[in-house]
Structure formats: structure tokens, C-alpha cells
Amino acid sequence: MRPIPLDLGVAAIVLRDSKILLVQEAQGPHEGQWGLPKGYVNPGELPASAVIRELHEECGIKGTVTGICGVRECVRNELARIFIAYHVQTSNQPLAIDVDEISEARFASADELEQFNWISPAMHDLAKSGLLNDSPLAKIDYSTTQSYPYLVHIAKEEIPI
């Protein structure tokens, strides 16, 4: 394989009591709009590690990736842009938002999702899917058998061929 330039982002799908964690952007082009806790992957960082870091930076909570809920992919200005939404399991830790990035955070039910001013239709769809569906791709961590971070995400059910 050959490396290519890539814009790689991640989002956390965190559920509590049948509600999903949403954040309102405090600044930038999406100021005042709602979405999932999200951010960019740093060089040399696994996307699954980045989502845990971003969740802690933005909302002050820690968690564990349990699987992938969805992926958004597009090409803009000749640059591939990939965005991975991970299910993240957390305990009932209190939220402690980073007010420089996030103006508000709250848990919302499926019935409430339509009332938000979303960052994008894709973000809305990822949140809705994450709230209504379990992770279709489960995580297997092979890092302990390799000399580097190594995760595989596979379907939970056997897929007939």
C-alpha cells in the first residue's frame, strides 16, 4: 500500500439511559450547531485512540471503544475525507466540557434529535443510527500479539457468502 494525503476524523457515540451524548460547537464555522463529540486523528495515532482522547478533551469523560457505528467518506478539493463514528462505553461520569470548544453538552432521546441545528445531515444520521443500533462492527484488539497498535473491526454475525 502507498500512503495518500487524508483528512481523518472521529466521533464518539456515547449512550446513557437510551439517550445519546450531543455537543454544541462553541466556535468556528459550526458555532452554535450540534453534533457528536468529535475531532481529528493525530499523526501516529489510531483513530480508536483519537476518539477516546477527543471525548475526554471535550467532555471530561473516559471510555472504551466497543465498535464502529458508521463511516462517512467524501472527496473535497481532491482530498479524501474519512470520518469514523465509534460506539464508546463509559461509566456514569459527570460531564466537564471544554468551554473553549463546546458551549453545551447534553444527552438527547431519539424523539429530540429533530429539534437540533445539526452540523450536517451526515452527523444527524450517524447520531440517529448510533442511538437506535448497536455497533454493527465489533472491535478485536490484536495489539498484544503485534509490535504496534493493531485493531480489526468485523461483523458480529457470520455473513453468508
Can you say where each PLM-predicted feature lies in the sequence?
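Conserved N-terminal beta-strand and adjoining loop/helix that marks the start
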Residues: 1-20
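Short coil/loop residues immediately preceding or within conserved phosphate-binding loops
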Residues: 7-9, 31, 81
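Short loop/turn microsegments at loop-to-beta-strand junctions
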Residues: 9-10, 46, 103
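A structural signal for short, well-ordered beta-strand segments
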Residues: 12, 68, 86-88
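Conserved Nudix-box catalytic region and its N-terminal flanking loop in Nudix hydrolases
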Residues: 19-57, 152-161
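A short coil-to-beta-strand element that immediately follows conserved catalytic motifs
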Residues: 62-70
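Active-site-adjacent beta-strand/loop module that shapes the phosphate/pyrophosphate-binding cleft
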Residues: 73-95, 106, 110-112, 119, ...
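Nudix hydrolase/Nudix homology domain
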Residues: 101-161
